[in-house]
């Protein structure tokens, strides 16, 4: 655990965030997060998102679909507070919220995941604050379908890994998913976070995630993701083309 604190310092050196006034967050809970007429552009370029209207309710599992370049990742980073809006309104339970506050609500898992030199445990605890419950650690690893892989390693959670070796691309992605599940943020965004998994492994991971009572958004291009969500949002050219409920065998709150 002590070694993980050192690894956390490494993470802070890698993820450099612009200085900003820290927003006052009421609590890490919400009923709905709403984007109304939100647009985004990079500098003087053409809008990459145009007049987005999207309301996310607590406990929903949403698939954000669309072709490459449709604006899925840009919207995901807007939802995560990493990009700022050029126009429109963002509210949390009908109160205005800034991107600094929004960032505290969301854990974002990108498609390209990274492994830092250190142990499996250190990598799992990067960015994690507070005491780690062993049962919770084992549970999230099982949900991410990475526990068996870890247990087969020479030293288990104390096995040394690095970006250049030790883990396959799929294992890196599942490790990142487990790390996200350890976080306390109520909204999890997975941006093509299962793209490196074979269909059987992806199906197991998605089925596990669908049962977890947290709000999740999956940016994906595989139609197989649809069977694990309650709602499908389709994007075309920076706009939401459709937003409809999806049949889902699971129940959410």
Q: Can you say where each PLM-predicted feature lies in the sequence?
A:
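ATP-binding Walker
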Residues: 70
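Conserved H-loop
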Residues: 147-154
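Conserved post-Walker A segment of ABC ATPase nucleotide-binding domains
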Residues: 24-27, 77-142, 183, 204-213
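The feature captures the beta-strand-to-loop junction immediately N-terminal to the Walker
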Residues: 65-67
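Cytosolic ends of transmembrane helices, especially the final helix of ABC transmembrane type-1 domains
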Residues: 1-14
